[in-house]
UniProtKB/Swiss-Prot annotation:
Subunit-level organization: Component of the 30S ribosomal translation pre-initiation complex which assembles on the 30S ribosome in the order IF-2 and IF-3, IF-1 and N-formylmethionyl-tRNA(fMet); mRNA recruitment can occur at any time during PIC assembly.
Protein name, UniProt field: Translation initiation factor IF-1, chloroplastic
Pfam families reported for this sequence: eIF-1a
Protein family (similarity comment): Belongs to the IF-1 family.
The keyword Transcription appears for this protein: no
Keyword entries, A-Z: Chloroplast, Initiation factor, Plastid, Protein biosynthesis, RNA-binding, rRNA-binding
Gene: infA
Organism field: Cercidiphyllum japonicum (Katsura tree)
Highest taxon in the source lineage: Eukaryota
Gene Ontology CC terms, in alphabetical order: chloroplast; cytosol
Presence of the UniProt keyword Cell membrane in the record: no
A GO molecular-function descriptor: ribosome binding
PANTHER family per record: TRANSLATION INITIATION FACTOR IF-1, CHLOROPLASTIC
Lineage: Eukaryota, Viridiplantae, Streptophyta, Embryophyta, Tracheophyta
Localisation: Plastid, Chloroplast
Length: 77
């Protein structure tokens, strides 16, 4: 049976080594996020200040996998 995961949105607050990031969720929780393989393969750059979707396990709510970088409203791309 596949593990159930929660999907949250958050803001990247700090960049850490090896594709890890400190993410502040919309509910004000601060968790550790790592880049999913699909984002890593696509060479998508994630910087502090970016909004992301993050998938969090029910069993360990202190870590999550970054699955999507949301587009900023003020950028031209």
């Amino acid at each position: 049976m596949k593990e159930q995961k929660w999907v949250h949105e958050g803001l990247i607050t700090e960049s850490l080594p090896n594709g890890m990031f400190r993410v502040r969720l919309d509910n004000e929780d601060l968790i550790l996020g790592y880049i999913s393989g699909r984002i890593r393969r696509s060479f998508i750059r994630i910087l502090p200040g970016d909004r992301v979707k993050i998938e969090v396990s029910r069993y360990d709510s202190t870590r999550g996998r970054i699955i999507y970088r949301l587009r900023n409203k003020d950028s031209n791309d």
